[in-house]
UniProtKB/Swiss-Prot annotation:
GO terms for molecular function: DNA-binding transcription factor activity; DNA-binding transcription repressor activity, RNA polymerase II-specific; nuclear receptor activity; retinoic acid-responsive element binding; RNA polymerase II cis-regulatory region sequence-specific DNA binding; sequence-specific DNA binding; sequence-specific double-stranded DNA binding; zinc ion binding. Residues 83-158 bind DNA. It comes from the Eukaryota. It comes from Homo sapiens (Human). SMART domains: HOLI, ZnF_C4. Pfam families: Hormone_recep, zf-C4. A zinc finger (NR C4-type) spans 86-106, 122-146. The gene is NR2F1. Binds DNA as dimer; homodimer and probable heterodimer with NR2F6. Interacts with GTF2B; this interaction is direct. Interacts with COPS2. Induction: Inhibited by gonadotropin in granulosa cells. GO terms for biological process: cell differentiation; negative regulation of neuron projection development; negative regulation of transcription by RNA polymerase II; nervous system development; positive regulation of transcription by RNA polymerase II; signal transduction. Keywords: Activator, Disease variant, DNA-binding, Metal-binding, Nucleus, Receptor, Repressor, Transcription, Transcription regulation, Zinc, Zinc-finger. This is COUP transcription factor 1. Coup (chicken ovalbumin upstream promoter) transcription factor binds to the ovalbumin promoter and, in conjunction with another protein (S300-II) stimulates initiation of transcription. Binds to both direct repeats and palindromes of the 5'-AGGTCA-3' motif. Represses transcriptional activity of LHCG. It is found in: Nucleus.
């Protein structure tokens, strides 16, 4: 049986129904068309292909509309006998929704989940079967599959806004400005940005005032939030949650200190020597002069890396791409599929290059300068970061152990160590 979606209309329906402005209701019911008119209504201006009409017949088809809720079938779907399945559950597709051919059920489920920002939990092993008969049994795995097959969150968020109209405040820089007027964001970068759990306001005004000397308690709290936020961000970006848990742990255990430096630069974390030494407890325990000097050298290296990033005026989209490039490294030990991880790093790098060339056409060397900052992040010793920011919080517990606990617990902000207060 031929599949006809609501965005295509047989001209003879208009003639038979005496309704040149719309389809014949009886004929539409006989076809069993897709979603309701409110969901499937098309708007002019997107320029997507449509089924041509026979010359001289009334009832020209509606032009495709926003990227969100198209309901658009494949070309010629009204005349072919092709049956297109929902890429999520295998049921009969009603058209193209949020970038993929899906049924009405999966389309509505995805839209509801994204618009309401719903969070689901899998009671099994996060690998439940999703088909016509089991799609309602696990919402977590159903949403996971929607994202895996390529349904786009950003298409839902745009709703029916015209393509040229920006969504005010949708993506904000650390200074609170919307991406300096940049209207271009690839779908991948959009998802990276939406995974960011730490807007500047979360850390208060102190974090944004480099000349303000923070107290030890504030330093401990801010550092903990930056670390926890890095893990939370990784858990919500594309592709990372689909990796084996052992691979997730390996990647974060290797790269956590680099992500921490990037987050510190992004929020303009004050790095004054005196409170950092106090936070590290150097005044409480005897230390040789040589060791103190060496420790201060490490602090200087940390400060330099942060300042060099700040000097480039890196925006939020660039920070997200840089963190993804750092995270998806095949250098981690014991990866089950290093080639796949490397391909994700290449995808992140290509997304950054495309974004930079589109948004900064007058800075041809900007992409190279950003990439050149990444190798030097490893010059900041992870053990020094632990001593500076976390020894008062968790004692001798290795950061790698904490990261593993955060991943396994499923929530960084409800992590048990957060109950420990800096003293």
């Amino acid at each position: 049986m031929a599949m006809v979606v609501s965005s295509w209309r047989d001209p003879q329906d208009d003639v038979a129904g005496g309704n040149p402005g719309g389809p014949n209701p009886a004929a539409q019911a006989a076809r069993g068309g897709g979603g309701g008119a409110g969901e499937q209504q098309q708007q002019a201006g997107s320029g997507a292909p449509h089924t041509p009409q026979t010359p001289g017949q009334p009832g020209a088809p509606a032009t495709p509309g926003t990227a969100g809720d198209k309901g658009q079938g494949p070309p010629g779907s009204g005349q072919s006998q092709q049956h297109i399945e929902c890429v999520v559950c295998g049921d009969k597709s009603s058209g193209k929704h949020y970038g993929q051919f899906t049924c009405e059920g999966c389309k509505s489920f995805f839209k509801r989940s994204v618009r309401r920002n719903l969070t689901y939990t899998c009671r099994a092993n996060r690998n439940c079967p999703i088909d016509q008969h089991h799609r309602n049994q696990c919402q977590y795995c159903r949403l996971k599959k929607c994202l895996k097959v390529g349904m786009r969150r950003e298409a839902v968020q745009r709703g029916r806004m015209p393509p040229t109209q920006p969504n005010p405040g949708q993506y904000a820089l650390t200074n609170g400005d919307p991406l300096n007027g940049h209207c271009y964001l690839s779908g991948y970068i959009s998802l990276l940005l939406r995974a960011e759990p730490y807007p500047t306001s979360r850390y208060g005004s102190q974090c944004m005032q480099p000349n303000n000397i923070m107290g030890i308690e504030n330093i401990c709290e801010l550092a903990a939030r930056l670390l926890f936020s890095a893990v939370e961000w990784a858990r919500n970006i594309p592709f990372f949650p689909d990796l084996q848990i052992t691979d997730q742990v390996s990647l974060l255990r290797l790269t956590w200190s680099e992500l921490f430096v990037l987050n510190a630069a992004q929020c303009s974390m004050p790095l004054h020597v005196a409170p950092l030494l106090a936070a590290a407890g150097l005044h409480a325990s005897p230390m040789s002069a040589d060791r103190v000097v060496a420790f201060m050298d490490h602090i200087r290296i940390f400060q330099e890396q942060v300042e060099k990033l700040k000097a480039l005026h890196v925006d939020s989209a660039e920070y997200s791409c840089l963190k993804a490039i750092v995270l998806f490294t095949s250098d981690a030990c014991g990866l089950s599929d290093a080639a796949h991880i490397e391909s994700l790093q290449e995808k992140s790098q290509c997304a950054l290059e495309e974004y930079v060339r589109s948004q900064y056409p007058n800075q041809p060397s900007r992409f190279g300068k950003l990439l050149l900052r990444l190798p030097s992040l490893r010059t900041v010793s992870s053990s020094v970061i632990e001593q500076l920011f976390f020894v008062r919080l968790v004692g001798k517990t290795p950061i790698e152990t904490l990261i593993r606990d955060m991943l396994l617990s499923g929530s960084s902000f409800n992590w048990p160590y957060m109950s420990i207060q800096c003293s």
